[in-house]
A protein has these predicted regions:
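Metal-cofactor-dependent catalytic cores
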Residues: 1-211
Length: 211
């Protein structure tokens, strides 16, 4: 990661104004994007030349990869914890857009079996699971209360071919929220060998955001 100090920052929408962003520094200082000096303040905080850019809610510009969303299941995180009990496989290490809460007792890397399939989240959002996600050393870095741990990536590499989670493209946009069910797209249900499995639910993710 070019700027590891960014992991120490937190972001939130300004209270009562979703058009402004607050950046919270490790010492608790709040930098507001509405402040005329914001760009200078964020550069001084990070010690590198950076610029905050605003995109409309529905962006006209597509991400070049076409695989804009990262999804991981709690089953995968629990499976990794079982392989390396001393490690903390907190979702923050892996920076997913969406965390799917797997049914109780379910383990293994469930989302890897969804590659090539179409899934629906909530009433309208539809994603295509494009590929598994190869991990890098950012997963080992210290951030907030998570310590540096090189064995996180070592375990993923040795036990699961250096992949954790999947990358998805958006087939149909929609609003998603914590608690939404994730299930096979209706057009594919009859063709999926595991369509009888109980639906999964979002436990974390792009809460109330359009994808």
């Amino acid at each position: 990661m070019a700027f590891p100090s960014m992991l120490d920052l937190k972001a939130r929408f300004a209270q009562g104004d979703s058009t402004r962003l607050d950046i919270i520094t490790p010492n608790g200082r709040v930098l507001s994007s509405g402040d005329p000096d914001f760009q200078t303040q964020i550069r001084e905080t990070l010690g590198v030349p950076v610029k905050l850019m605003e995109f409309p809610q529905v962006a006209e510009t597509r991400l070049r990869s076409g695989r804009a969303l990262h999804l991981v299941t709690t089953a995968s995180l629990i499976s990794m914890e079982n392989l390396y009990p001393e490690g903390d496989f907190d979702p923050r290490r892996f920076r997913p857009n969406i965390v799917v809460n797997s049914p109780p007792g379910r383990n293994g890397f469930a989302e890897e079996s969804w590659v090539g399939e179409t899934i629906r989240i909530g009433p309208e959002a539809t994603l295509r699971v494009e590929k598994t996600n190869r991990r890098c050393k950012v997963t080992t870095m210290k951030q907030d209360d998570l310590p540096y741990d090189g064995k996180i990536l070592e375990t993923i590499s040795q036990k699961n071919g250096n992949v954790l989670g999947v990358m998805c493209s958006v087939v149909k946009g929609g609003i998603i929220a914590v608690g939404d069910e994730l299930e096979p797209s209706p057009a594919e249900i009859d063709d999926l060998p595991h369509h009888s499995a109980p639906p999964r639910h979002l436990s974390q993710g792009s809460v109330g955001n359009r994808i």
